[in-house]
């Protein structure tokens, strides 16, 4: 690499954005093919390519940031702004689902029976599994904060314990959500209620899986001594994302499960 007289990271050409984009195309088209033709081939190909891209792209970033020292303070500042803007874009993404839900529920049409929930829909009890899920996610928010403070204080073992606990709580939430879907008395095809419920809670569930993956990578990196008390932005970004997922769930719980039922 040529000598440079500034602190910014001039990245090398990388194939991973292209392979990531192809994986996204395969995943979206594969989901449509799965829904309509019951074939999992395209979806499986998309998942494999996405996993390969994630592994190799994150490997390269760890090499550049942790071992080559390219993540200087100005670069980290840029990464912080990038993560903040990414989470902001996610807020607007979920805003669309809440808009759809409130648009349909605040002025239900005659086709829905003029009431909400629509006539014939049996809703889920908000004080059973959804309330347990809320407690699980709030607890995971506490454990991820514990992990953050442990990293800043150089408490390696406590960080590993707290991160492990957070990931387990994330997987437990996903399991409970899956069981709730399996036992739900309505489907995604049951009119606007089914559509808004499953799309909003389903995308949130996907974000929980993504957040759990981020934290699992952070756990592996912590075990391999990648983080110091001063240099741990990878974990910080994952923690921000986890708190965002937490807050979105609270809005989902209050809006769709409690008020909407």
Curated annotation (Swiss-Prot):
Residues 1-15, 67-72, 153-155, 224-232 are mitochondrial matrix. It comes from the Eukaryota. It catalyses: 4 Fe(II)-[cytochrome c] + O2 + 8 H(+)(in) = 4 Fe(III)-[cytochrome c] + 2 H2O + 4 H(+)(out). GO terms for cellular component: mitochondrial inner membrane; respiratory chain complex IV. Keywords: Membrane, Mitochondrion, Mitochondrion inner membrane, Translocase, Transmembrane, Transmembrane helix. Belongs to the cytochrome c oxidase subunit 3 family. Component of the cytochrome c oxidase (complex IV, CIV), a multisubunit enzyme composed of 14 subunits. The complex is composed of a catalytic core of 3 subunits MT-CO1, MT-CO2 and MT-CO3, encoded in the mitochondrial DNA, and 11 supernumerary subunits COX4I, COX5A, COX5B, COX6A, COX6B, COX6C, COX7A, COX7B, COX7C, COX8 and NDUFA4, which are encoded in the nuclear genome. This is Cytochrome c oxidase subunit 3. The gene is mt-co3.
């Amino acid at each position: 690499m040529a000598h440079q007289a500034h602190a910014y990271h001039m990245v090398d050409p990388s194939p991973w954005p292209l392979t990531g984009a192809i994986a996204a195309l395969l995943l979206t088209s594969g989901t449509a093919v799965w829904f309509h033709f019951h074939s999992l081939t395209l979806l499986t190909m998309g998942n494999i390519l996405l996993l390969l891209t994630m592994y190799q792209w994150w490997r390269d970033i760890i090499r550049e940031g942790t071992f080559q020292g390219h993540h200087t303070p100005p670069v980290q500042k840029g990464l912080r702004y990038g993560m903040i803007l990414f989470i902001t874009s996610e807020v607007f993404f979920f805003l669309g689902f809440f808009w759809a839900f409130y648009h349909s529920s605040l002025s239900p049409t005659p086709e829905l029976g003029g009431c909400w929930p629509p006539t014939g829909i049996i809703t889920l009890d908000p004080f059973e599994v959804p309330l347990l899920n809320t407690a699980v996610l709030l607890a995971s928010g506490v454990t991820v904060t514990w992990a953050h403070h442990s990293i800043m204080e150089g408490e390696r073992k406590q960080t590993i314990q707290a991160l492990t606990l957070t990931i387990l709580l994330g997987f437990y939430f996903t399991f409970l959500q899956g069981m709730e879907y399996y036992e739900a008395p309505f489907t995604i095809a049951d009119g606007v209620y089914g559509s808004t419920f499953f799309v909003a809670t389903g995308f949130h569930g996907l974000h929980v899986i993504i957040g759990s993956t981020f934290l699992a990578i952070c756990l592996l990196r912590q075990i391999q001594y990648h983080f110091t008390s001063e240099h741990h932005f990878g974990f910080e970004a994952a923690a921000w994302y986890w708190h965002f997922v937490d807050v979105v769930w609270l809005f989902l719980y209050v809006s769709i499960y409690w008020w909407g039922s």
